[in-house]
Structures are given as C-alpha cells and as structure tokens.
C-alpha cells in the first residue's frame, strides 16, 4: 500500500491510500510514523498507525478538555466516553496523562480545598461530597480536610448570612437561620454553634417591635379570612412563635389587638 495523499484538516490530517482506505490522524501520528506522500506501508504498519491515531486523538481531546481548568480523572474519563473514544483506549490515555502530570487527583483535592479557603464558603462535609461526585476517593480527601482550619471560612459565611437577615428576623430566628445556613454549607453543628455564639446578635427593642408589627399585620391578613376570635388568636400566636418571636412579646401584641 502507498500513501497517495496527506491533506490537512484544521488540527488533523486526512491520509488517503492508493487502495481507497483513508484515516484521520493527529500531527503526533504523522511525526511518530514519519508519514509522507508516496510512502509505502504494509498491513501491519497500517494497523499500528490506526491504533496510535485513535490513542493520540483521544489524548488530544483530553488535553483540550483540561487545558484551561483542572479536572479529576473521572471527569476526563466521562468526557472521553461522551466523545465516543473507545473504552478500551481510555485506560492507556489516562495513564499517559497521569505520567505527564496532566491529571492528578491528589493535586486536584489540594487545589480545590485551598481555593475554598481563599474565596469559598463551603464546609468539610459539602467539600467532600462535591469531590466524591467528581470521582475522587475519600482517602485522598479526608486527610486534606482534617488539616484545614474551617473556622475562619465559617465565620465569613455566618457574617454574610447575618448581613442578609439582620433587619428581617428577630434574634432567635436569626440565630436559627445562621446555624441552618452553615449546616447547609457543610459545617458541623458544633462549629456552627460556636461561630454563632461569637456573633453579636442583640437587637434593640424598637427594631424587634417593628419586625413583630410587620409580621403580625401580614399574618392577620392571611388568617382573618378563615378564623376569628380565640381560634384566630391561637393561629397568630403559633405562627409568630414559629418565626422566632419571644412568647411574652407575642402575648403583649395579641392582648393589645384583641
């Protein structure tokens, strides 16, 4: 067999043989086999070229995927499968990428956790969950999390929640909101409690009264359509208490109204 034509197609090359066969290959394939027009090749060489061309194409796709963003091994594997790279070739592609330090799950974990410490707001439980979803083994994750101090991250996250709700909720509800927010972000309950205890959540009585008045008026409009008298009073009390208002303040408000 003889190569009758080599035609460049963007980042790839189309090789045509004089027997009608053709194959799209990467530049690495051209270089590795020193392919050129009029070159004579036998059937075994052609099979070797096809095999390496598939490997090289898959590796090229993977390198493009990780060029601008660090990826885990599983992310690269999934990407290659999605782009119809043969499952038989993927292990050798992954091995080549690992040898070249293009993918390194331990380094991925280190970078991910460090970046969260600098600019993120996630706790260890959520970080572990997200990393495991990327296919990273827990034994690579847990030692890094154990060595990381999450108190300052939790502090910043708590302050952000506080700033958002300080003018909307009474102290008890605000405390619950911050703790629940920290739990949702993957921090432990003990750390969340400790962080909240360090915050100054005291509110002046006038502010609490204003919040109670606003909430009372809103709930009154809601429940007065269906209830009246004692039943309405009970519904209002229960709803206001669930929202974190002090029992004595609620009772005073209800007595003033009824």
UniProtKB/Swiss-Prot annotation:
Q: Where in the cell is it found?
A: Cytoplasm
Which Cys pairs are S-S linked?
Answer: none
Which Pfam family is one of those matched by this entry? RecX_HTH1
Q: Which domain of life is it from?
A: Bacteria
GO terms for cellular component: cytoplasm
The main location is: cytoplasm
Please list the GO biological process terms of this entry.
Answer: regulation of DNA repair
Keywords tagged on the record: Cytoplasm
Q: Which HAMAP family match?
A: RecX (MF_01114)
What is the annotated role of this protein in its UniProt record?
Modulates RecA activity.
The entry assigns this protein to a family as follows: Belongs to the RecX family.
UniProt protein name? Regulatory protein RecX
